[in-house]
Amino acid sequence: MFEGEFCAGWYWVIYSDANGKFHRALVGDKGEIILSAGAIGSPQLLLLSGVGSESYLSSLNIPVIHSQPNVGEFMADNPRNNINLVIQFPFSPSPAQVVRIMTSTEVSIATIAEKTTGPLSHGSLRLSSPKEAKATPLVRFNYFSDPADLSRCVKGVRKLGDMMNTNSMDRFKYTGFNGERGFMFLGPALPSNWSDDSSVEDYCRSTVTTFWHYHGGCLVGKVVDGDFRVMGINSLRVVDGSTFIILPGTNPQATLMMLGRYMGLKMLRERRESQ
């Protein structure tokens, strides 16, 4: 958690470390604060520090430093629906790797997933504690609240069903005591009634889970401007996934790393030009 104290063109930024010890950093009149705590942490810290909806902050007895009604709004995540198949023979998994960061893991379950990229549904972030930054905030993504997202999920789940009915997938089936062959699922199986939209919609809602692609809360054009400055506060920028209006179609890790590099170089150039 941090808070600012302004005096004669200078800022004292008060923050606490992982051990709960408080520190002060002096920021000059040309200095800046860069907040990069992620799609969950950045809006949470802004709210705790008094940057947010005036009515909401006042209801929590948090002093309003800067009125900004869109902090914590437009929270979104790429929803995922998947099936887990129990595999009855050894096989070589091919887990995804992102910019050589993730490590491979041996599995005995095959997971097949579909996701809705660029969801139109969004929710909000609220504080669970008005004083404690370590308290996990309350986040609602409201998956499939927009009918377009739900319609895309129905199409995606049906594609999974089409794939499961191919000859290539037959080798993953088990033979039951009655001689019939079928898949063994860990968790929910695909709905059997493909012709009924409501049945597949219920499946989408009941089996949705996250791809951990959280974004929103400090959107460009809503909370920060095109240079990622919090609008109305020239000395504060937010540079992370909380500013994204929409995510790339895959894991945003590499995009976020390049955003940090881009903004670092841009700010360095701006400082040199101002000298």
Region spans (language model):
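FAD-binding beta-loop-beta segment adjacent to the flavin cofactor pocket
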Residues: 114-126, 215-237
